[in-house]
């Protein structure tokens, strides 16, 4: 196989899959056990690293077994195993390395490049961690793409007609909904929604809770304090969930689960599908609203959707399929294996990047507005939410004080008009600014979001060309609850926020004009007559009193007096380097500063 091969990897919470594209046809690669999905499990035993099916078989007996590491990606947490502390990236790298190795053996050649998928709501830190895991595994990660987007890519490979597609992706540990527009080989994401803390594992856990309660009632034994027994319950709960997708009732038989005072406990219980659906209905309900939110954000109704694609093994549950059908009014498309479709889409994107496929263009979006904090605590947006990525936006700001040689750029994410109501992503300082009157230095702030959804922010002094850059790396996950809270809060507080913003901007404008009047009086010196000085001092005092009282309506009226008074200084524009219009413009673009 002479052509360059790019692996398409779905690095999942519970299972992972690797695919390739040969010509234009995607192929899922089997692991050494002949399976197309590999458990995302790592175990350590006698100095050996064990990955996949063999590791999963040790979950019950080997305490040095790690599962669901994806939930910790992008955090500072570590896991202890094999008498060592491991970062999430290291464990994920072991899974990736295992898949890379068996792919190379299957293909008969070395492979060094990959496209890896992540949930749509993975933040910068989680995406960076995923890329780093790939690097540790010896892979050059060409692209990080969203799982629902990858699924749509796989679904639409041979589709030439225009259509709107909704992707419902319920995996082992995460849930995503995306709405896409497919036309002439272009895949444009219109909206995304979801929950980073909801997946098939949660359905398993409900069965575990039920089993724990039943065992305590029937056998008088508290399983919750028995780690070994809990691991066995978890395994049997997952099996029961899977079986209930095809059966109306399952028998759960667990011989020798534990030893009680009355002897060995042999569990024999039955669980009906109706009971299972009742105990997990609250989980299913949590997936309904993201569907509605994604449609609303895309400005579409359910009737506008042409195809509904189910992704993730958890979508095999009949209750999930029925809910999606009722909510959207159409039968979901189940023509592609839900466990494999994301990896197939990643492989297709790899084929595009390798030049094997040339009739597909993928356009993803950013989920929330990005901006900076400006003078008065105002949130100034640079990149609005649902902007197609990659994207770059620059805006020029200035200083807020005379002779200021340093500014602090505070990067925020969210939809509120005041910075303090949004999420702080990071901050950095730009130093070495040439001393000058306030409003004179020109500082260009640039936001760049790459194709992987990773954000970089830079600030550059246009005169000295000094520049500082930060890559946003959040230490905490941004959950769907946070996302929706930001959006709802912005809507609910729209009028109040607008009032607060107007107050802040009016005060900033007043303080700026007071400063300019004082400078103008100083510049005039003895040339200014006593009456003008007296009137100016009086107005400045009144203005400052109104600022202190936050009497905004009266303050706005007084501002007009100050501005009219300033017209008496004929040469003010040259001496203070600001006119009324320039002052207004400057104050709209003044960054938050650190005064030295």
Swiss-Prot record:
GO terms for molecular function: ATP binding; ATP-dependent protein folding chaperone; unfolded protein binding. Residues 576-596 are annotated as: Disordered. Disulfide bonds: none annotated. Pfam families: HSP70. CDD domains: ASKHA_NBD_HSP70_DnaK-like (cd10234). InterPro entries: ATPase_NBD, Chaperone_DnaK, Heat_shock_70_CS, HSP70_C_sf, HSP70_peptide-bd_sf, Hsp_70_fam. Induction: By stress conditions e.g. heat shock. The modification Phosphothreonine is found at residue 174. Keywords: ATP-binding, Chaperone, Nucleotide-binding, Phosphoprotein, Stress response. NCBIfam families: PRK00290.1, prok_dnaK. Acts as a chaperone. Belongs to the heat shock protein 70 family. This is Chaperone protein DnaK. The lineage of its organism: Bacteria, Bacillati, Mycoplasmatota, Mycoplasmoidales, Metamycoplasmataceae.
């Amino acid at each position: 196989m002479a052509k360059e091969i790019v692996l398409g990897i779905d690095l999942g919470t519970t299972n992972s899959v690797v695919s390739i594209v040969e010509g234009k046809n995607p192929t899922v690669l089997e692991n050494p056990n002949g399976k197309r999905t590999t458990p995302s499990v790592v175990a350590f035993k006698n100095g050996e690293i064990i990955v996949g099916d063999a590791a999963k078989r040790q979950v019950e007996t080997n305490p040095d077994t790690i599962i669901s590491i994806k939930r910790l990606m992008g955090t500072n947490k570590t896991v202890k195993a094999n008498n060592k502390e491991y970062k999430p990236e290291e464990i994920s790298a072991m899974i990736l390395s295992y898949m890379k190795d068996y792919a190379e053996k299957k293909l008969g050649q070395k492979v060094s490049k990959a496209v890896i998928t992540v949930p749509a709501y993975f933040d910068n830190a989680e995406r960076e961690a995923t890329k780093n895991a790939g690097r540790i595994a010896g892979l050059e990660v060409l692209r990080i793409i969203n799982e629902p987007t990858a699924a749509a890519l796989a679904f639409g490979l041979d589709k030439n007609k225009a259509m709107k597609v909704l992707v419902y992706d319920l995996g082992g540990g995460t849930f995503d909904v995306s709405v896409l527009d497919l036309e002439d080989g272009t895949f444009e994401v219109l909206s995304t929604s979801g929950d980073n803390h909801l997946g098939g594992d949660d359905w398993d856990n409900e069965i575990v809770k039920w089993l724990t309660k039943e065992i305590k009632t029937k056998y008088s034994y508290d399983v919750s304090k028995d780690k070994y027994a809990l691991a066995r319950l978890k395994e049997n709960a997952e099996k029961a969930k899977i079986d209930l997708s095809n059966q109306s009732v399952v028998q759960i038989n667990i011989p020798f689960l534990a030893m009680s005072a009355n002897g060995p406990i042999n569990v024999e219980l039955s669980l009906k599908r109706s009971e299972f659906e009742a105990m997990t209905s609250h989980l299913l309900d949590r997936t309904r609203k993201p569907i509605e939110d994604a449609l609303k954000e895309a400005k579409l109704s359910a009737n506008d959707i042409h195809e509904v694609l189910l992704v993730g093994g958890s979508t095999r549950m009949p209750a999930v399929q029925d809910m999606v059908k009722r909510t959207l009014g159409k039968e979901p498309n189940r023509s592609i294996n839900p466990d494999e479709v994301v990896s197939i889409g990643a492989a297709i994107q790899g084929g595009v990047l390798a030049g094997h496929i040339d009739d597909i263009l993928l356009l993803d979006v950013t989920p929330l507005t990005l901006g900076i904090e400006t003078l008065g605590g105002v949130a100034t947006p640079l990149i609005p939410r649902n902007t197609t990525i990659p994207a770059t936006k620059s805006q020029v700001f200035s200083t807020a004080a005379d002779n200021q040689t340093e500014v602090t750029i505070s990067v925020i994410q969210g939809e509120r008009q005041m910075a303090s109501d949004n999420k702080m992503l990071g901050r950095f300082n730009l130093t070495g600014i040439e001393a000058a009157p306030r409003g004179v230095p020109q500082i260009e702030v640039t936001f760049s979001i790459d194709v992987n959804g990773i954000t970089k922010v830079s600030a550059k002094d246009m005169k000295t060309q000094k520049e500082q850059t930060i890559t946003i790396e959040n230490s905490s996950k941004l959950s769907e609850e946070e996302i929706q809270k930001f959006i709802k809060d912005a809507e609910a507080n729209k009028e109040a926020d607008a009032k607060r913003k107007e107050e802040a901007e009016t005060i900033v404008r007043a303080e700026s004009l007071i400063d300019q009047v004082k400078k103008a009086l100083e510049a005039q010196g003895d040339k200014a007559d006593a009456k003008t000085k007296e009137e100016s001092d009086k107005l400045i005092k009144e203005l400052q009193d109104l600022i202190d009282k936050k009497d905004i309506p009266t303050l706005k009226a007084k501002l007009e007096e100050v501005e009219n008074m300033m017209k008496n200084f004929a040469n003010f524009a040259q001496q203070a380097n600001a006119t009324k219009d320039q002052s207004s413009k400057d104050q709209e673009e003044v960054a938050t500063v650190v005064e030295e």
